[in-house]
From Swiss-Prot:
The keyword Transcription applies. One of its GO terms (biological process) is regulation of DNA-templated transcription. It comes from Orgyia pseudotsugata multicapsid polyhedrosis virus (OpMNPV). This is mRNA capping enzyme LEF-4. Pfam families: LEF-4 (PF05098). Keywords: GTP-binding, Host cytoplasm, Host nucleus, Hydrolase, mRNA capping, mRNA processing, Nucleotide-binding, Nucleotidyltransferase, Transcription, Transcription regulation, Transferase. Coiled coil: none annotated. The lineage of its organism: Viruses, Viruses incertae sedis, Naldaviricetes, Lefavirales, Baculoviridae.
Length: 457
């Protein structure tokens, strides 16, 4: 790269609290740990998104282009916190002063504090204009977001749903960790997340819990797909463990999705049963964590952690949860966190149902099963590529029963020429889990959590 071009990589986190809480964090935490700021400057953005940074003795103008904007979740073991972070890669290109527009779009005054190698930026936004300002106030933010999505343009400074006037100055707190290479050091990332947890803990007594659209939230919790299914041969001492990173028993229950929030947990199963309880969230940060689960009799087993949704603050609508900005949890992070919860928490009483538990994952090799206290029908395997596979002794499919013809149907049509073997009364239009052999279809159980039959390969 030339002298006028700079590639910058950083991990970023924004503290999303009201103004009074941000100043509380500044006075009671940041200033006590770092009495003197490391740097002060003022950023001016023109109409072309060129940033001019003015310090006490210099002024430099650059145009920042976003090359990478990736959301991820880091698990902080010390406090069992799932910290939602953003990894950014930007290209900064120097701009001559005579090419900077005279029209100022934003003016931000920033004070930078250095804590454990992390830049803690306390910002005062004196002016901020954007595409939303030209529309009616109640719908402006949504219209601007829609235009951005339709045009396919990523904004380096995304519009915020805020109102600034002559008597309003918006405060913001941002944490940034700059790094070089493929990824930041694990110790640096842990120290970064420790700062996040310690700062946000100062707001715990405010019990921030905005209203949530639970149906939309659970619909957003998409379970991971199985990339393959492998049959286990009968009589083998243990299945082949080649390429296995972690494994767990495949529970034979009703699948569901749920969400943890502080003081409350909600579960919806695939057969449209709802379970809710006022229980404490096991995680260190006040966020929404979605999960996949399996309901077996009177027990709910959390089998996977899927996403983190953050609460956000603006001075128009106060606190809200943006369900369009999910932070995905990697499969290996979810497995490590579940193992920690299995050992540290064990079971949580669930009033009116039974209890909530966390599934345990094991290191290879896969162990043969002789006796278990809960029904299982195989293994769940996480391979070295962090893809899920299921190992079963008897691969099954979901088929729909058609009473007039007396046949079972896949999604492609009736399966003819095979004997239907069933120990239960079959109902027209119901979906059943079945095992197909050369000459017969063995009906194992009814699947009220399935609406349509599956494909038979």
């Amino acid at each position: 790269m030339g002298a006028d071009v700079l590639i910058e990589q950083e991990i970023s986190y924004t503290i999303n609290f009201s103004q009074d809480l941000l100043y509380l964090i500044l006075d009671s935490y940041i200033k006590k740990r770092c009495a003197a700021p490391a740097e002060r400057y003022t950023d001016l953005y023109d109409a072309n998104n060129v940033r001019t940074r003015q310090t006490a003795d210099s002024a430099v103008s650059v145009h920042k282009t976003n090359l990478r904007d990736e959301r991820f979740v880091h698990w902080l073991r010390s406090s069992n916190a799932l910290v939602p972070l953003v990894r950014r890669e930007n290209r900064e290109t120097a701009v001559p002063h005579d090419r900077v527009s005279r029209h100022i779009a934003s003016l931000i005054e920033t004070t930078v504090y250095k804590l454990d190698g992390v830049d803690v930026k306390f910002e005062h936004v004196y002016m901020q204009s954007g595409p939303a300002d030209r529309y009616e106030s109640t719908a402006a933010h949504k219209i601007a977001a829609l235009k951005t999505a339709l045009l396919g343009v990523d904004c380096a400074r995304p519009s915020q749903n805020l109102q600034l006037g002559s008597d309003a100055v918006l405060a913001r707190v941002r944490l940034e960790l700059e790094f070089e290479g493929a990824a930041p050091a694990a110790a640096s990332l842990d120290a970064f997340c420790e700062l996040v947890v310690q700062m946000e803990t100062l707001a715990d007594h405010h019990n921030i819990a905005p209203c949530l659209p639970y149906t939309t939230l659970l619909d957003s919790a998409t379970p991971r797909r199985f990339t393959r299914e492998q049959r286990i041969a009968y009589g083998a001492q243990a299945p082949d463990s080649t390429g296995v990173k972690k494994w767990a028993f495949k529970l034979d229950g009703v699948r569901g999705r749920g969400a943890f929030r502080r003081g409350y947990c909600l579960v919806q199963t695939d057969d449209m049963q709802l379970h809710a309880a006022c229980i404490s969230s096991p995680f260190g940060l006040n966020n929404v964590v979605t999960f996949q689960c399996e309901v077996v009799a009177d027990k709910i087993f959390v089998t996977d952690l899927l996403q983190v949704f953050r609460y956000k603050y603006n001075n128009r609508t106060q606190y809200e949860c943006n369900l369009h900005d999910a932070y995905p949890i990697n499969a290996d992070v979810a497995v490590e966190c579940l193992n920690r919860l299995h050992c540290a928490v064990g079971s949580v009483p669930w009033p009116g149902l039974g209890e909530l538990r966390f599934q345990q994952f094991f290191d290879p090799p896969l162990a043969p099963t002789h006796y278990t206290t809960i029904p299982i029908d195989g293994y769940i395997v996480l391979d070295e590529q962090l893809q899920y596979a299921k190992y079963k002794w008897l691969p099954t499919v979901e088929l729909e029963y058609d009473a007039p013809s007396g046949a079972l149907h896949s999604i492609d049509g009736p399966l003819l020429g095979k004997t239907v073997v069933a120990d239960l009364q079959l109902k027209h239009g119901a979906v059943y889990e079945c095992a197909i052999t050369d000459n017969a279809i063995n009906v194992l159980k009814c699947r009220p959590d399935r609406i349509v039959p599956s494909k038979v390969c």
